[in-house]
Amino acid sequence: MEKYLNDAIIGNKNMLATFSSKGEMLRLSYPNHDNRQYLKYFHTGVKVNDSNIIYLHDDINNTYIQYYDTDTNILNTEITNTYFNLKIVQTDFVTIKEDILVKKYSFINDSNIEQDIKFLIHSELLSDQNNFISGMKLDNGMVQFAHDFSIA
């Protein structure tokens, strides 16, 4: 798959985010749609019990259904892992009045076995020698930042 083959787009007048058909966020533009890209990659995954990392956008046992809520720019990607009978509903949208990208994940255990599910994010911001980036963990969240922007 080419990196910039966009299957879904969400945004407002200042912010634009594009996604693959498997829910992978490919691009994020701000403060206008033609501005620079901020993400090198943004991958999410889970660990179920003692399993290896299951990347939500790329696992052989995952099936995908993607749709917009009716008459909105709210994008839903339903990811079902058939091995663990785990359904993940990923909801992505950009608020209309504020330039905020919201990513929400709901986990539904459809198996008869109790599962210990850990949610993981593996991401990297685009940078160069003059624009160093860093990150830090705060409570149950993560912030990545440079001198002129941050992603939390």
Roles of regions detected by a PLM:
Residues 1-152:
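Terminal accessory carbohydrate-recognition/targeting modules of carbohydrate-active enzymes
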